[in-house]
Design a protein with these regions (language model features):
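Rossmann-like NAD(P)(H) cofactor-binding subdomain of soluble oxidoreductases
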Residues: 91-130
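Conserved hydrophobic helix-helix packing surfaces used for dimerization/oligomerization
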Residues: 8-9, 120
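Redox-cofactor binding/interface segments in oxidoreductases and associated redox assembly factors
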Residues: 79-80, 122
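Short glycine-/small-residue-rich Rossmann-like dinucleotide-binding loops
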Residues: 82-83, 125
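Conserved N-terminal Rossmann-fold NAD(P) cofactor-binding segment
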Residues: 6, 31-75, 84
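N-terminal Rossmann-fold NAD(P) dinucleotide-binding loop
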Residues: 19-20
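Aromatic pocket-lining residues of Rossmann-like dinucleotide-binding sites
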Residues: 26
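Conserved glycine-rich cofactor-binding loop
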Residues: 15
Length: 130
């Protein structure tokens, strides 16, 4: 399989629904073979990793981690759907407040570990304010 680049791409929130779908899309489209799945929830990201290992993506080098330093170091591309989902009884403002903290940590990780990143795509809830 031919890829558009060999640079590292990190998928943040890879254990969630959007993130796990992005992994498959990235590999099916041949964007890069070097994909790191990152999520703070180890059982979720490990499950997605196991699923991807069962797929036929020749030449893919997929890794996973719950360590931000390992995930972000050397990344040139980042897709993040790592915001928290809305829970019962939460207002949009509650969700925004919680996801602002997550977004700040996300930005800090980029600054610390991959300041030369080329492209970052962020999808957080509430989606109309990110």
């Amino acid at each position: 399989m031919e890829f558009l680049t060999n640079e590292k791409l990190v998928i943040v929130g890879a254990g969630g629904m959007i993130g796990s779908n992005m992994v498959q899309s990235v590999l099916m489209l041949g964007l890069t073979p070097n994909v790191c799945l990152y999520d703070i929830y180890e059982p979720g990201v490990h499950g997605v990793f196991d699923e991807i290992q069962q797929c036929a993506f020749p030449g893919a080098n997929v890794t996973y981690t719950v360590d931000p330093k390992e995930a972000f170091t050397g990344a040139k591309y980042i897709i993040s759907s790592g915001g928290a989902p809305r829970k019962d009884g939460m207002t949009r403002e509650d969700l925004l407040k919680g996801n602002c903290k997550i977004a700040a940590e996300f930005g800090d990780n980029i600054k610390k570990y991959c300041p030369d990143v080329e492209h970052v795509v962020v999808i957080f809830n509430p989606a109309d304010v990110t």
